[in-house]
Swiss-Prot record:
Superkingdom, taxonomy of origin: Bacteria
Upper classification of the organism: Bacteria, Bacillati, Bacillota, Clostridia, Eubacteriales
Top-level EC class as recorded in UniProt: transferase
Protein name, as recorded: Anti-sigma F factor
Protein species of origin: Clostridium perfringens (strain 13 / Type A)
The EC number(s) this enzyme carries: 2.7.11.1
Summary of the function given for this chain in its UniProt record: Binds to sigma F and blocks its ability to form an RNA polymerase holoenzyme (E-sigma F). Phosphorylates SpoIIAA on a serine residue. This phosphorylation may enable SpoIIAA to act as an anti-anti-sigma factor that counteracts SpoIIAB and thus releases sigma F from inhibition.
Coiled coil regions in record: none
Catalytic activity: L-seryl-[protein] + ATP = O-phospho-L-seryl-[protein] + ADP + H(+); L-threonyl-[protein] + ATP = O-phospho-L-threonyl-[protein] + ADP + H(+)
Keyword Transferase: yes
């Protein structure tokens, strides 16, 4: 492993931007293209938003954890919550599926993450939380 960071913050929607910028600053050492940077920022934004809205149901007292690591030319980003978990992971990963239909922009989070990253793994257990691991090779 070349480098690693860990960040913990309260599940407040205003911290989503902070998380995105922090990961961007961390990966700057790889000299990413604007497109790579935008892809990663978007994926991080979706993962953090999912943790806040779905995992913790907007309970701002809870904590979201982000870990990012660089190994050669690959970035690995983990976003984790200890929230309610995802009951049906397969269904949740379907485009346009949402557990919150009343929200304006919902149902595309996992699809966006899969589109912008090279790989996406999701681990979740009901009432224990969700861990999302995203990877992307840089400068390809």
């Amino acid at each position: 492993m070349d480098n690693k960071m860990r960040l913990e913050f309260l599940a407040k929607s205003e911290n989503e931007g902070f998380a995105r910028v922090s990961v961007s600053a961390f990966i700057a050492q790889l000299d990413p293209t604007i497109e790579e940077l935008t892809d990663i920022k978007t994926a991080v934004s979706e993962a953090v938003t999912n943790a806040i809205i779905h995992g913790y149901e907007c309970d701002e007292s809870k904590v979201v954890i982000i870990e990012a690591s660089i190994c050669e030319d690959e970035i690995s980003i983990t976003v984790e919550d200890n929230g309610i978990g995802i009951e049906n992971l397969e269904e949740a990963r379907e485009p346009l599926y949402t557990s919150k239909p009343e929200l304006e922009r919902s149902g595309m989070g996992f699809t966006v993450m899969e589109t912008f990253m090279d790989s996406l793994e999701v681990y979740s257990e009901k009432d224990k939380g969700t861990k999302i691991i995203m990877k992307k090779k840089m400068n390809t």
